[in-house]
UniProtKB/Swiss-Prot annotation:
Disulfide bonds: none annotated. It catalyses: L-seryl-[protein] + ATP = O-phospho-L-seryl-[protein] + ADP + H(+); L-threonyl-[protein] + ATP = O-phospho-L-threonyl-[protein] + ADP + H(+). Residues 28-289 are extracellular. One of its GO terms (cellular component) is membrane. The keyword RNA-binding does not apply. This is Putative cysteine-rich receptor-like protein kinase 39. It holds the Pfam family Stress-antifung. Belongs to the protein kinase superfamily. Ser/Thr protein kinase family. CRK subfamily. It comes from the Eukaryota.
Length: 659
């Protein structure tokens, strides 16, 4: 048994290593309606596919064509990466076509695209088809991504790595979009760089040549953002869209870097010299008397520092009696400190809480815009004096947000609790809150479908972090459009954690007599029975999602909420009725998919609602099967009677967070 066992272990280990490094060779994404396999459309597509590989080569690497007449016309685009060999390009395009024809999710779908790659031939290529012309248009969806199975080692300095990686991504985007040539392969860039802790990092970007330079920059930027939001921390990854693709890795690929000069790592900070300050410039030692003088001065300084420490510690000890922020000592996950702001500093920043700096009025106080001495803009929430609930909110926000850090959560910079003042200082988010856009007829027109999709996905990621990915398990309890802030790039940030509830890691549900939240967004089991779980937040998310799609407030429908109205239209087979008129020309299938997700989130039975991790998977995939929803809350007689019987005080919490 001995030598055979060793041999089997060796073979199994080798196979495991191979499987871990196997790459998926093509990225296929399909959307749109279905067509009959025996239809004229199907025949036109087959005929177009039969000549496409050779046409790409004879046209310099990029080819756009159409065949047939409406409604059976087929449009196709094909592209081979720069530096290709002709036969390699032909094989790649043919492989891409086979991927479209054989992928289960693409069978007889009208819109399809694939970025195929052949590591052996060192070539990548694109093939896309549709029943409408995409030539010259920026196409961002569907998107497909892959990531390395391996994570970056925990011992690496991720803050430094991210800074260097961001700089490399920005350089590559700029280089790819310069388009100094009129070549059909003009939007292309390959870069090789040395990082402080990695000898070689490789990055490749390319766009189809039919779009503008600005569209190319937008497409590549969306690829980079998607990678960072979904799989950051991996040792490589790829994102493919119909108009562009992006890939980076720790090893060379596609033969794209053979003639690329490596960008050196940024200079490290200069080390301090070893020469003693007690030595004179000309190398002569300071005399005995000089040493005595230095010792005396240093001793005096130490005494002053000690006295100052005692005074500061005394003040802090008094403050700690008011609020306990745990053992974090005001340090967030980036190693930056949570500041205890001096009241004078806050007064100076807000011009003594000038009414001209008022951003809004909330349930527990007023929010002001402020500017610190270093020029940083902040949002300052001054809680109402003597408010018992405000005191609870203050302690809750500080104790939770000192330990949370995520791109889709608002960042608490510090606080002040001098005398009877309770003040929270946040990062300033310039675009106010989501409700200012989605419920305003004029501003809502600025929210494109792509922007709304990104906002919805960002909110979902923030919730996933709270429920599953952070060191804590937190239920927000007051999710609504006015508690979603939008930064300068319209990225969402979940805000207002005053009513949030901290769960133990193994705790899934709790009960409370203190109902905190806003009517219309609260799950029925929480509103009626005080039952709290992650599914309570999922319900609120579903309401917001439906508001984003319809552009209407949840309470805009007399006699029934938005969820009930959407459910009735869904059962009637007319879900498009609830779609915002500003979105009527947008991808209908995607919008209806999100209506379906929203209805799943607001189902009456909390166990039937999805987790936020499932929502993220559905949002990012074109191929996953999404279950059909059941009836939402408050649509049956049982729910209606519960509404009439339920007891609720005016415990409706803050309608405005820091903005």
């Amino acid at each position: 048994m001995g030598k055979y066992s060793v041999l089997m272990i060796f073979i199994a280990s080798s196979l495991l290593i191979v499987l871990q490094n196997v790459e998926i060779v093509n990225a296929v994404g399909c959307t749109g309606s279905f067509f009959n396999g025996n239809s004229s459309y199907a025949q036109n597509r087959r005929d177009l596919f039969s000549t496409l590989p050779n046409k790409v080569v004879t046209n310099g690497g990029f080819y756009n064509s159409s065949l047939g007449k409406s409604p059976n016309i087929v449009h196709a685009v094909a592209l081979c990466g720069r530096g290709y060999e002709q036969q390699a390009c032909i094989r790649c395009v043919d492989s891409a076509i086979q991927g479209i024809l054989t992928t289960t999710s693409c069978l007889n779908r009208v819109d399809s695209f694939t970025w195929d790659k052949d590591e052996e031939d060192n070539v990548s290529c694109l093939v896309s088809t549709s029943n409408h012309s995409t030539f010259g248009n920026l196409e961002l969806r569907p998107s497909v991504r892959y990531q390395s199975p391996n994570s970056i080692e925990p011992s690496k300095n991720m803050t430094l790595f991210e800074q260097e990686w961001n700089a490399m991504a920005n350089r590559t985007v700029e280089s790819a979009t310069e388009a100094e040539t009129s070549s059909v392969l003009k939007y292309y860039s390959a870069e090789k760089a040395e990082f402080t802790e990695f000898p070689n990092v490789y990055m490749l970007m390319q766009c189809t040549p039919d779009i503008t330079s600005q569209d190319c920059k937008t497409c590549l930027g969306e690829c980079v953002t998607l990678f960072k939001e979904q799989v950051w921390g991996r040792q490589g990854g790829e994102v493919y869209r119909p108009s562009c693709f992006f890939r980076w890795d720790l090893y060379a690929f596609h033969g794209a870097f053979d003639n690329v000069t490596r960008v050196p790592a940024p200079p490290r900070p200069q080390a301090q010299g070893n020469e003693s300050s007690i030595t004179k410039k000309k190398g002569r030692s300071i005399g005995y008397g000089g040493i005595i003088a230095i010792v005396v001065v240093l001793t005096f300084i130490n005494i002053l520092v000690f006295i100052g420490y005692i005074k500061v510690y005394g003040r802090r000890k008094e403050s700690y009696n008011k609020i306990n922020v745990g053992s974090a000592e005001y340090s967030d996950s980036d190693g930056q400190f949570m500041l205890r702001f001096d009241l004078g500093m806050v007064l100076a920043a807000t011009d003594e809480f000038s009414s001209e700096n008022t951003l809004g009025q909330g349930g527990f106080g007023t929010v002001y815009k402020g500017t610190l001495l270093n020029g940083q803009e902040v949002a300052v929430k001054r809680l109402t004096k003597g408010s018992g609930q405000g005191d609870i909110e203050f302690k809750n926000e500080v104790s939770l947000l000192t330990r949370l850090q995520h791109r889709n959560l608002v960042k608490l910079l510090g606080f002040c609790n001098e005398g009877d003042e309770q003040i929270l200082v946040y990062e300033f988010v310039p675009n106010s809150s989501l409700d200012h856009f989605i419920f305003d007829d004029e501003k809502r027109s600025l929210l494109t479908w792509e922007m709304r999709y990104r906002i919805i996905e960002g909110i979902a990621r923030g919730l996933l972090y709270l429920h599953e990915d952070s060191q804590l398990k937190i239920i927000h309890r007051d999710l609504k459009a006015s508690n979603i802030l939008l930064d300068a790039e319209m990225n969402p940030k979940v805000a207002d954690f005053g009513t949030a509830r901290l769960f133990d890691s193994d705790e899934t549900r709790a009960e409370t007599k203190r109902i905190a939240g806003t009517r219309g967004y609260m799950a029925p089991e929480y509103l009626n029975h005080g039952q709290i779980s992650a599914k309570s937040d999922v319900y609120s998310f579903g309401v917001m999602l439906l508001e984003m799609i319809s552009g209407e407030r949840n309470n805009s429908f007399e006699g029934e909420g938005l969820a009930a109205f959407a459910w009735k239209r869904w059962v009637e087979g007319k879900p498009e009725i609830i779609i915002d008129p500003f979105l009527i020309e947008k991808p209908r299938n995607e919008i209806i998919k999100l209506i379906q997700i929203g209805l799943l989130c607001v189902q009456e039975n909390p166990t039937k609602r999805p987790t936020m991790s499932s929502v993220i998977i559905w949002l990012g995939s074109e191929t996953n099967i999404i279950p059909l929803p059941k009836a939402p809350a408050f649509t049956g007689s049982r729910s209606q009677s519960e509404i009439g019987a339920m007891s609720m005080s005016d415990d409706v919490f803050t309608e405005l967070s820091c903005r």
